[in-house]
Amino acid sequence: MIRSLSIIICIMAMVVSCKTNVVEEQKIELKNQLIGLTSAHNARQLGGYQIGNQRIKDNLLLRSAKLSGLSGEDSTLLADKYKVQCIYDFRGEKESLSAPDVIPGKARYLSLALSFGGEESGTDTKFENEEQMIGMLLQYADHPSVQAMCTSMYDVIFFEESSQEVYRKFFADLLTVQPEDGAVIWHCTQGKDRAGSASAMLLAALGADRELIMADFILSKVYYDPMSSKIKTETESQKTVINTLISANPVIFEATLDKVDAKYGSLRNYLTECIGVTPEMMEVLRDRYLE
């Protein structure tokens, strides 16, 4: 009887031990990731995300929309609180020249220009305001080039050699950064597509699974949906354009990730084969940014 009781107690202890080692399902919420900027959209961090039994360190890996309208207060916040030491700008050359970043403190600026068709061909259009741009998108929602942008944008980002070269430069530079010296921030225009793809790649390098990568991407949709929902659309094409180019479209993004997996086996394999991020480099990044 005593022996049986001892066995039961041992089993119970093992069960409790197993439960304490199980990583609880994390709840990803936009409010927990925002970094307090009021003059830049979609400004948030990867810090706090749980990867296995570790988590990403707070206040080191930041992402946002363009920083051209950064206020003095927000610039000070990035310089003093986050000690931003490098800005990675994924906007095309014409985008960044027409709206140059405000550089916080003594941060280093690196242009990683990744352009889509219109800018590269010299056919890009200047808009006086956001309403004018939205009006154009609605008017030409059925145009083949606009539809192609919606359906193939992430394929361009992940599979075109020129895009891959941009992300090679991103990782090569990031590996030279010492996190004890402060944060880095990367952005594009809205901080959701080119910057979002950089985030997905970095999360994969840090060991994140598809679920976490998609959860981070979806936060851009959560951020922009309140704005895009106010735009009146009349056709399915218009809805698709607004949901993809003004908000974020996780269905299209995940379809590209599926193509990556089909061709390379995993996003981490893709990073090694196409971006040149070796397993050893990934280990360096994990040592620096996980705790």
What residues fall within each predicted segment?
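Cys-dependent protein tyrosine phosphatase-like superfamily
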Residues: 18-185, 197-291
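Bacterial Sec-dependent N-terminal signal peptides
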Residues: 1-23
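Ser/Thr-glycine-rich phosphate-binding loops at phosphate-binding pockets of nucleotides
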Residues: 190, 194-195
